[in-house]
């Protein structure tokens, strides 16, 4: 009596954590909302099978068709759903039946190698780092067919060695020569050679059913001989008879059982295996990269991420600007300030708490930013920015402060001017123009604010000082308490800070089609709850952007700065403002003289 041919499970999956990391990256950056099947590849190590069946390994390189050339490569695909509901509602029986039918058709058309393939269905919860997946390798046979073993025999080691060197898991023998198991050769071949996925004695892998179904439909014969090659001494050849109808409906199976031995999906929770800092990094990037899925596919997030921001003034504006930059994924933020945290600061300045009172502001702000996001590169510098019109009192210290400021501006990409005093902004404005940096200015009134980007040589737009006909001078001496403190409606700083950062982000984009056009100035008025966009040209006699001023600073450095601190009039003289003032005074005198002449003539 003949024995029915039995089969072992076709495979056992091993999904490395690197596969999920790569799937996450591709889903976020490449696939996005595209839920079409994507090709996978698995390198089968048929020479080192430690369990009863081959291990189907999936790693980060499984998305790359170029795998280890010495290994047998099996093709597959992954269908990653956009929602967990879609994953759960997928008809798994229908899915594998359709895949089995496709494999049969591919086998009949292209040969036995094309009738074996694996499939992964998955859902990646990118926020929780949890992955749901199910792997299958469809095996099929016609419903009315069965397979009987007529005889078996061992295979000589020499023959096995010659065949094993072939870099394919399936081939056939025609007139004593090994050939590809294509339909052309399957019609006339004497036997098929299969590098078996199973190590159970006398029991081949279930994909043998695929080979027999395809082969028996291509070539009608009484028996079919298959050589099952293995790396141990259990290789054997079997003569098999296919009985019953071989053209009816397909019976398809092949879903892998989970760890409990049930036909159900598996899951992998990587959150406990990951460094919390890495999780924070990826979570920040996740929220931003989701913008590219539908809303802003062309947004340049890398430029925002890699830009180096220098925040001059670590008060209310500075704190909110830093938080907004962090939310946009910026990784490099430097603070500069000359004061310490006062008891009134923590309620208005979100990077400080009560324990920070008395600490240098820049240092405390930097430390707080690193507590919020440990991967940020941040530093705090306590220094006084030399102010035009404020005479030099300690030259060695002020010169050192100038040199540090100059180096900071030179090594950063964008400079935020967020200081209280107008004259504090003059030197950074000149240095920013000299080093050709992006300069963003924000200033507050009681219920109004100004946000602007300084112009450059290309756009001919004005800077913060381009509307002035006098250079800034000492405005801090002899001021009352309400003039020394920033008296403003608390919400104004948030509005100005957020618009300053959004202005920068918009300006950094490659075109106006991404986030719109970047205005030159934004003026907000909270008493009317409105904003106005303005654009003003550069003023040739501006005390900060005038070419003579910039060239003099470039050539003379500290010596010119010292001169400007002691006497702001020298800047007016250099920029041409003095002449403008003289002409204006002369015009006024002429108007007065004209009015006097008219009065005399009337009398």
UniProtKB/Swiss-Prot annotation:
Keywords: Autophagy, Cytoplasm, Protein transport, Transport, Ubl conjugation pathway. GO terms for molecular function: Atg12 activating enzyme activity; Atg8 activating enzyme activity. The active site is at 485 (glycyl thioester intermediate). A motif (GXGXXG motif) lies at residues 313-318. The GxGxxG motif is important for the function, possibly through binding with ATP. E1-like activating enzyme involved in the 2 ubiquitin-like systems required for cytoplasm to vacuole transport (Cvt) and autophagy. Activates ATG12 for its conjugation with ATG5 and ATG8 for its conjugation with phosphatidylethanolamine. Both systems are needed for the ATG8 association to Cvt vesicles and autophagosomes membranes. Autophagy is essential for maintenance of amino acid levels and protein synthesis under nitrogen starvation. One of its GO terms (biological process) is protein modification by small protein conjugation. It is found in: Cytoplasm; Preautophagosomal structure. Homodimer. Pfam families: ATG7_N, ThiF. Disulfide bonds: none annotated. One of its GO terms (cellular component) is phagophore assembly site. This is Ubiquitin-like modifier-activating enzyme ATG7. Belongs to the ATG7 family. InterPro entries: Atg7, Atg7_N, Atg7_N_1, Atg7_N_2, ThiF/MoeB/HesA, ThiF_NAD_FAD-bd, Ubiquitin-activating_enz. It comes from the Eukaryota.
């Amino acid at each position: 009596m003949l024995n029915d041919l039995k089969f072992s499970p076709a495979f056992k999956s091993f999904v490395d954590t690197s596969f999920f990391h790569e799937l996450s990256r591709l889903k976020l950056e490449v696939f996005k909302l595209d839920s079409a099947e994507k090709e996978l590849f698995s390198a089968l190590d048929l020479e080192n099978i430690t369990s009863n069946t081959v291990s189907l390994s999936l790693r980060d390189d499984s998305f790359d068709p170029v795998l280890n050339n010495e290994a047998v490569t099996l093709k597959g695909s992954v269908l990653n759903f956009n929602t967990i509901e879609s994953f759960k509602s997928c008809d798994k029986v229908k899915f594998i039946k359709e895949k089995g039918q496709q494999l049969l058709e591919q086998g009949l058309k292209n040969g036995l190698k094309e009738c074996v393939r694996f499939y992964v269905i998955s859902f990646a919860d990118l926020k929780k780092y949890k992955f749901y997946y199910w792997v299958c390798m469809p095996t099929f046979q016609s419903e009315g067919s069965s397979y009987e073993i007529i005889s078996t025999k061992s295979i000589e080691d020499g023959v096995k060695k010659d065949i094993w060197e072939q870099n394919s898991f399936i081939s056939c023998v025609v007139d004593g020569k090994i050939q590809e198991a294509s339909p052309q050769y399957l019609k006339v071949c004497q036997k098929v050679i299969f590098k078996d996925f199973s190590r159970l004695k006398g029991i081949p892998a279930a994909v043998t059913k695929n080979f027999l179904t395809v082969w028996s439909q291509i070539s009608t014969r009484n028996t079919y001989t298959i050589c099952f090659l293995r790396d141990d001494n259990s290789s054997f050849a079997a003569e098999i008879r296919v009985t019953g109808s071989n053209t009816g409906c397909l019976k398809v199976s092949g879903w892998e059982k989970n760890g409990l031995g049930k036909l159900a999906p598996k899951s992998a929770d990587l959150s406990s295996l990951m460094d919390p800092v890495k999780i924070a990094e990826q979570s920040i990037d996740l929220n931003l990269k989701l913008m590219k899925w539908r809303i802003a596919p062309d947004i340049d997030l890398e430029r925002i991420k890699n830009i180096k921001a220098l925040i001059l003034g670590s008060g209310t504006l500075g704190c909110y600007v830093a938080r907004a930059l962090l939310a946009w994924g910026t990784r490099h933020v430097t603070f500069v300030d000359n004061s310490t945290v006062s008891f009134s600061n923590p309620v208005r300045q979100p990077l400080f708490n009560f324990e920070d009172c008395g600490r240098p502001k820049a240092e405390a702000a930097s430390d707080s930013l690193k507590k919020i996001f440990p991967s940020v590169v941040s530093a705090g510098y306590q220094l006084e920015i030399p102010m035009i019109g404020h005479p030099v009192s300690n030259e060695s210290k002020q010169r050192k402060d100038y040199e540090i400021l100059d180096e900071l501006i030179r090594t950063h990409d964008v400079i935020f001017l967020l200081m209280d005093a107008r004259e504090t902004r003059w030197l950074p404005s000149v240095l920013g123009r000299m080093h050709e940096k992006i300069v963003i200015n924000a200033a507050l009134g009681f219920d109004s604010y100004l946000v602007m980007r300084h112009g450059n040589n290309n756009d001919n737009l004005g800077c913060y000082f381009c509307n002035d006909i006098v250079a800034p001078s000492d405005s801090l001496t002899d001021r009352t308490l309400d003039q020394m403190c920033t008296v403003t409606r608390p919400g104004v700083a948030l509005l100005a800070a957020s618009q300053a950062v959004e202005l920068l982000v918009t300006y950094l984009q490659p075109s106006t089609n991404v986030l719109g056009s970047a205005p030159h100035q934004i003026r907000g008025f909270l008493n009317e709850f409105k904003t106005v966009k303005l654009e003003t040209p550069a003023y040739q006699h501006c005390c900060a952007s005038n070419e003579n001023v910039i060239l003099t600073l470039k050539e003379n450095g500290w010596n010119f700065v010292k001169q400007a601190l002691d006497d702001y009039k020298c800047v007016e003289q250099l920029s041409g403002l003095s002449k403008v003032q003289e002409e204006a005074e002369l015009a006024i005198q002429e108007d007065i003289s004209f009015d006097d002449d008219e009065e005399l003539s009337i009398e």
